[in-house]
């Protein structure tokens, strides 16, 4: 199993893999689900290298895993854009910078966001934690939509069209941005010839 790197003070279980690659005598590699970890020898508050054990489905004797705990020098802020009335989607993982100038990731637990903060155009910050003493900040920009790019596509009778995953959105301050879109289309929409209007829903927020 590859070495696992965890930031000092970060919850270990959130960063451990869920599967392990098992190499059989015939050369076949197959993934097995990890069922448990024994972390008694691990101290996430003290930088260093630790050896822990785990168990996996189909592996009678268990396995060993090397975990390196590194000192964290900085947690990178996150920039997110959303549209009015849509709760911003904050990332599960954030980037951390270690003292040895390498980078890694950690799971962030974000504070709840009151609806009034994204009810109108503006900006606000959200605080998240990646450990008892480590915080991360998300800078959220809320924009009001002025217009959305109209899409026109052709398809064959009975064949679902290839629709774009994003569209250009123009905001009230005259800026534009590509935003993800979810199309509300079914097979019934392409069962007869002619022009059909398909509704798309903006996905709401982007991490930049």
Describe the residue ranges of each PLM region.
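Solvent-exposed, low-complexity, repeat-rich "mucin-like" stalks and linkers
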Residues: 1-29, 71-103, 144-176
